[in-house]
Structures are given as structure tokens and as C-alpha cells.
Amino acid sequence: MSEDSEHVLICVAWPYANGPLHLGHVAGCYLPPDIQARYERSLGNSVLMVSGSDEHGTPITVTAEQDGVSPQDIVDKYHMINSKALRDLGCSWEPNVDSRGIEFGGALFNRTSDEEHKLIVQENFKKLLDAGFFERKTTPQYY
């Protein structure tokens, strides 16, 4: 990496792990950032691209009830299927975070249940909270 290179973070959507990915996922949220990551790497930039399976939500519970299994069974199954599908399509999702640390780039397709993921989210939330970026207020909600 040269002195002119930059650190680039590409954050990709985290779809629910309640079923297999479809063409809309690939064209809409995975192919564009993969192209961007490849472009940035071609410029010599250090790129970290992150995404994964969102393992929380009603769609997972509904699928589990329909299949007669636990929500954990559903997310385990579809995280594996979806991460393999993206790699098979040639997307940059091989688990290849640089051994020196995430600041040196790579790709990470993770899970919201991962302990490290939980810690990072909590740390960032606390930093934003302490910096005054959140405001508590009441608003009407229409449903």
C-alpha cells in the first residue's frame, strides 16, 4: 500500500437469513459494492467490505414456524447457504480479513449473533450516544 492509498470501508446490506438469496439481492445489494471494492483495490486502496446475515426479525420466526423448526435452525441453514452462494457467484466474500487486522482490509460476511459483532455494535453505539448523536423524543406512529 502506498502513501497515497486510502482505507475504504464498504458496508453492505444485511438481509434476513430466512431463505435463499435471489437475483434481486445479487443485483441490488451485493454486485454494486463488490464492483466498488474491486475498483478500490485496483487503485491500491485498503478495502474492508462487511456484510452478513441479519438473524433477528419476524421473517425468520415465520419461516421457522412454517418449517416446524427453531429460528436458530433457520438462520444457521440460510447463513451457510447464502454465504456459499455469494462465493460461488464470484463475489469478494471469501473470509480473507488481513491477518494484521481489519484495518488492512479484506472481506467479512458475518452474522449478527457473532460475539465480536455484538461487541463492535455496542462499542459504536456507546460512542455515538456519548457524543450526543441520539435524541430521545416521542413522536406519533401511524399503523
Question: Where in this protein do the model-derived segments appear?
Answer:
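N-terminal, positively charged nucleic-acid-binding surface of large information/translation enzymes
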Residues: S2-Y143
